[in-house]
């Protein structure tokens, strides 16, 4: 029996704007054009990011039998022989039951056709990440392997599916209660420090 255990939401506009500026900086460092197009002034950048934010759609399953919720890119981008990775602030977070996590995996078609993968191979979004300093903002870092597609560039349009989120349950060890746990305060990657 399938249970309803989670709810996708958008992060605040302010969080999305902060993370988009970081992603734009990273993309330009690896040779990409600005994710903000020809916007130059702060006001133009805010307006461009507001448009992206307003168009973010919450993840959905394509069919009744689909396990994955399609996560879409909020902006256009290109990956090719020169630009091999990108950080994508999705604008999303996920509130879920304590004994679940959200697994983030690449869309299989993009993996087969373009060698697209997540930089960390699989994303794990813990249930307590929802309350992190960055509002639990789910971000995908995608990498592109041109040798797998004969150098064909991957051109992604805003709204195109880039990854999938799959809700999974997990167990704990019998002696787990003996280990002192920390409370999550940081954002992305903060519990491994």
Regions found by a protein language model. Name each.
Residues 1-193:
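DUTPase catalytic domain/fold
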């Amino acid at each position: 029996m399938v249970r309803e255990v989670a709810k996708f939401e958008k992060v605040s506009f302010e969080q999305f704007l902060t993370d988009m500026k970081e992603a734009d900086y990273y993309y330009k460092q690896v040779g990409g054009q600005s994710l903000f197009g020809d916007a130059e002034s702060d006001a133009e950048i805010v307006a461009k990011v507001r448009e992206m934010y307003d168009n973010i759609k919450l993840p959905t399953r394509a069919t009744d039998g689909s396990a994955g919720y399609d996560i879409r890119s909020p902006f256009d981008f290109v990956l090719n022989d020169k630009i091999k990775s990108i950080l994508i602030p999705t604008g999303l977070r996920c509130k879920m039951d304590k004994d679940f996590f959200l697994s983030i995996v690449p869309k299989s078609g993009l993996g087969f056709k373009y060698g697209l993968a997540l930089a960390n191979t699989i994303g794990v979004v813990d249930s307590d990440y929802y309350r992190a300093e960055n509002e639990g903002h789910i971000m995908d870092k995608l990498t592109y392997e041109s040798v797998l597609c004969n150098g064909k560039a991957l051109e992604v349009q805003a709204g195109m599916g880039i990854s999938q989120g799959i809700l999974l349950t997990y167990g704990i060890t019998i002696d787990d209660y003996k280990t002192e746990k920390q409370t999550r305060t940081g954002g992305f990657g903060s519990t491994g420090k």
